[in-house]
Design a protein with these regions (language model features):
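Residues forming the flavin
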Residues: 17-22, 27-32, 37-38, 48, ...
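C-terminal catalytic lobe of FAD-dependent flavoproteins
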Residues: 40-97
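Short acidic, gly/pro-rich beta-turn/loop elements at beta-sheet edges
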Residues: 4-5, 34, 44, 96
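Flavin-dependent oxidoreductases
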Residues: 1-27
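Residue-level signal for well-ordered alpha-helical segments
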Residues: 3, 9-11, 33, 63, ...
């Protein structure tokens, strides 16, 4: 728990501004979800952990000896502007994409 708080002290979700972006946040049980390793127009990599881990360690070098419990691939979509889109549907209903 202390390690998790040191990674993201304000417990905010983060997306970097690199062209091949990485994104990360903490779960309720203080696990780090770290995404990235984008491969445009190609097949899913055979080993996503091998693709993601170097960038994760650039961001969080203190995780060098931490085991990755789960790794998966999938589609990630973003607008042409590459900027997040936020809005309000109703008084108490907000969205982000």
């Amino acid at each position: 728990e202390d390690v998790a708080r040191s990674l993201l002290p304000n417990n905010m979700a983060v997306e970097d501004c690199n062209y091949l972006l990485d994104y990360f946040r903490l779960t309720r049980d203080n696990r780090l979800i770290y995404g990235g390793g984008v491969v445009y127009g190609a097949r899913d990599p055979a080993n996503i952990e091998r693709l993601i881990r170097p960038n994760m360690l650039k961001t969080f070098p203190q995780l060098a000896n931490v085991k990755i419990d789960y790794a998966w691939t999938g589609n990630f979509l973003l607008p042409r502007s590459r900027l997040p889109q936020l809005g309000r549907l109703h008084e108490n209903v907000f969205y982000g994409k």
